[in-house]
Curated annotation (Swiss-Prot):
Residue positions of motif Nuclear export signal: 147-163
Chain location of the short sequence motif Nuclear localization signal per the record: 231-244
Protein localization: Nucleus; Cytoplasm; Cytoplasm, Cytoskeleton
Task of the protein: Adapter molecule for TNFRSF1A/TNFR1 that specifically associates with the cytoplasmic domain of activated TNFRSF1A/TNFR1 mediating its interaction with FADD. Overexpression of TRADD leads to two major TNF-induced responses, apoptosis and activation of NF-kappa-B. The nuclear form acts as a tumor suppressor by preventing ubiquitination and degradation of isoform p19ARF/ARF of CDKN2A by TRIP12: acts by interacting with TRIP12, leading to disrupt interaction between TRIP12 and isoform p19ARF/ARF of CDKN2A.
Sugar attachment sites: R235, R245
Record's comment describing the protein's domains: Requires the intact death domain to associate with TNFRSF1A/TNFR1.
Domain Death: 179-289
The name this protein goes by in its record: Tumor necrosis factor receptor type 1-associated DEATH domain protein
Length: 312
């Protein structure tokens, strides 16, 4: 890979930052879904990451996933030194402090205590923070699997419009003195961003898809086609489902070894549905499949393939 202007392009890696509020009254996934809070939450994340890791040239958000009650931020690192700086800020608590400060201001709370987790692939980096070299190796091994999400570009445009609108009213002391106050008054004065898909839909390959709880047919389709990758999908689902966290997957593999891969995969989703109830949705499964390069299985679940193997 060719070096960029600052030599950062030679070193590129990816990680996932899990952010969850410890306050029952603050659910970050809900706040990010709210049209009038979304820009403020994005701005808070962006500001905290810039403070702890550097400019978007070296630390970029690729996508923000909602996984009730968490937000999962996919990060792209360009450059070993900026990544090391981010890891030190994470280890020393500077990133947590910056996020808590920014999110409290964005959501009009006195404080928003946070629980954070950092993962690179299957590695939970929180347990490895004392070994920075190993953390860097884990992040480097996870090459970004996507370009920046279009939704984040739209939020960036909305934020830029918001800043321009505030600058044009620089004589208004109330606006200028509280740039991180709840965005409702400011957003009403500027052109809002394009509305997100309704809460009951999600985007798949750029198209809105109706979200719903997983059905028995979904579980059967998944179990029939996923094969050996059921454990990888389980690793993705376990981030937002405590019932699937270690050693649950190993237990499933052992308990249903005689029955084979179909039963192991079926029982994985059965446990997911039992634990999450109506929150065990099609969207969460499809995102886990996409993360593990199982797009064709996602298309089967969504009914987007015809019997001849082409797109419906």
């Amino acid at each position: 890979m060719a070096a960029g202007q600052n030599g950062h392009e030679e070193w590129v890696g990816s990680a996932y930052l899990f952010v969850e509020s410890s306050l029952d009254k603050v659910v970050l996934s809900d706040a990010y879904a709210h049209p009038q809070q979304k820009v403020a939450v994005y701005r808070a994340l962006q500001a905290a990451l810039a403070e702890s890791g550097g400019s978007p040239d070296v630390l970029q958000m690729l996508k923000i996933h909602r996984s009730d009650p968490q937000l999962i931020v996919q990060l792209r690192f360009c450059g070993r030194q900026p990544c090391g700086r981010f890891l030190r800020a994470y280890r020393e608590g500077a990133l947590r402090a910056a996020l808590q400060r920014s999110l409290a201001a964005a959501l009009a709370q006195h404080s928003v205590p946070l629980q954070l987790e950092l993962r690179a692939g299957a590695e939970r980096l929180d347990a490895l923070l004392a070994d920075e070299e190993r953390c860097l190796s884990c992040i480097l091994a996870q090459q970004p699997d996507r370009l920046r999400d279009e939704e984040l570009a739209e939020l960036e445009d909305a934020l830029r419009n918001l800043k321009c609108g505030s600058g044009a009213r620089g004589g208004d002391g109330e606006v200028a003195s509280a740039p991180l106050q709840p965005p409702v008054p400011s957003l009403s004065e500027v052109k809002p961003p394009p509305p997100p898909p309704p809460a009951q839909t999600f985007l798949f390959q750029g198209q809105p898809v109706v979200n719903r709880p997983l059905s028995l047919k979904d579980q059967q389709t998944f179990a029939r086609s996923v094969g050996l990758k059921w454990r990888k999908v389980g690793r993705s689902l376990q981030r937002g489902c405590r019932a699937l966290r270690d050693p649950a997957l190993d237990s499933l593999a052992y308990e249903y070894e005689r029955e084979g891969l179909y039963e192991q995969a079926f029982q994985l989703l059965r446990r997911f549905v039992q634990a999450e109830g109506r929150r065990a949705t099609l969207q969460r499964l499809v995102e886990a499949l996409e993360e593990n390069e199982l797009t064709s299985l996602a298309e089967d679940l969504l009914g987007l393939t015809d019997p001849n193997g082409g797109l419906a």
